Amino acid sequence: MEFTKLLEERRSIRAFDPEKHVTAEQIQEIVQAAIQAPSWKNSQTTRYYALVTPEKVEEFSAKCLPEFNQKSSKGAALVVTAFVKDRSGFTQDGTPDNEVGNGWGYYDLGLHVENFILRARELGLDTLIMGIRDEKAIREALSIPENELLGAVIAVGYRAINPDKPKRKTVDDILKLF
């Protein structure tokens, strides 16, 4: 698929087809694309935990997501959580390289997730990134260690609807040339 078309087609989907499934090979292809994202000093701190059976997805959603995200992700074939493991943006002696400090881990996670969702779309899958979730419940449900910081929860599956493209700002709205 042409890259520009891919960017234009990708949407946050809030209605998934529960009859369609995602294969292990598709999940691996998506994560392989995510791995290609750049990271601070090549630290590669992003980690994923994937719930791949309908029963686990349903149980996770009920325990870890607010009601509106449970509804929005219903029917998704899988749910993936993205974490930042350890720290990035620091020198070997532990001082921050700049004012962003460990924020680089989240920045890198965002780059990873962008690759993740675009590759999913290229494979014909759809996604919904959910930022509102119960971090404590997720840690308990997936036995996540304290040195991993939750960044995103992503529902993955096949769209049951085709939503309109949301209005975007223009280049003139966001770009200043000097």
Predicted regions and their residues:
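C-terminal helix-cap and adjacent tail motif
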Residues: K5-I13, P18, A152-F178
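Helix-loop element at the rim of GNAT/NAT acetyltransferase active sites that forms part
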Residues: I13, Q36-A37
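A short N-terminal beta-strand-loop micro-motif at the entrance of redox/enzyme domains
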Residues: I13-E29
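Glycine/small-residue-rich phosphate/adenosyl-binding loop
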Residues: Q26, S39-L109
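Small-aliphatic-rich amphipathic alpha-helix that forms the alpha element of a beta-alpha
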Residues: A34-I35, V80, D86, T95-A141
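Short secondary-structure junction motifs
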Residues: S43-T46, L125, G151
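A glycine-rich helix N-cap at a beta->alpha junction
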Residues: N69-V79, S143-K165
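Short active-site-adjacent structural elements
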Residues: G89-T91, A137-R139, I161-K165
